[in-house]
């Protein structure tokens, strides 16, 4: 399951750029279904590392909280729910390669803030790191966040 998670947090272009179809060095003792590709090795290593560091219950609670959250529940519509948010300014960052939170959802959120007459800034970023780009693409995100807080 963790390997599937890792794959969906990143974009296909990044996987292709980093690994393509590169194989591990040949081994004399290799069995039919042993790890053969570098990407498999990466996924195997990182999934084992992750499992040793995190309690799976954290993800159950996080997943449940995400399932239960609905901004429209607090006003009947997304726009009405967003109108109830009391902030001075809002930053929405969408990443074109994010398949978990697609860019059209971020655009819908920006449109909702616009209709609710909220002070917001919407930034659409290009990054090959997909959903994880907010963690690893410091160069792009830092600039946007810095500018937002210093405007």
Regions found by a protein language model. Give the residues of each.
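Active-site nucleophile elbow and catalytic-triad environment of alpha/beta-hydrolase enzymes
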Residues: 45-46, 62-82
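Short alpha-helix in the alpha/beta-hydrolase fold that links the catalytic acid
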Residues: 74-79, 89-90, 102-113
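Acidic catalytic loop of the alpha/beta-hydrolase fold
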Residues: 49, 66-70, 96-101
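Short beta-strand/loop motif that positions the catalytic acidic residue
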Residues: 85, 91-94
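Catalytic active-site module of serine/aspartate enzymes centered on a nucleophile-bearing elbow/loop
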Residues: 107-151
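Substrate-recognition/cap regions that form aromatic- and gly/pro-loop-enriched pockets
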Residues: 73-82, 97, 102, 120-123
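Alpha/beta-hydrolase-fold enzymes
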Residues: 1-49
């Amino acid at each position: 399951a963790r390997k599937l998670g890792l794959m969906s947090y990143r974009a296909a272009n990044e996987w292709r750029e980093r690994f393509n179809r590169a194989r591990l060095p040949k081994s004399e003792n290799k069995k039919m279904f042993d790890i053969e590709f570098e990407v498999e090795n990466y996924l195997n290593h990182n999934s084992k590392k992750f499992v040793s560091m995190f309690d799976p219950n954290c993800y159950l609670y996080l997943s449940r909280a995400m399932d239960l959250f609905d901004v429209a529940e607090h006003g009947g519509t997304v726009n009405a729910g967003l109108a109830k948010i009391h902030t001075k300014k809002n930053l929405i960052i969408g990443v074109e390669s994010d398949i978990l939170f697609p860019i059209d959802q971020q655009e819908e959120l920006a449109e909702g803030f616009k209709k609710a007459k909220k002070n917001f800034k919407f930034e659409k970023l290009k990054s090959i790191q997909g959903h994880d780009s907010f963690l690893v693409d410091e160069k792009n995100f830092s600039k946007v966040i810095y500018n937002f807080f210093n405007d």
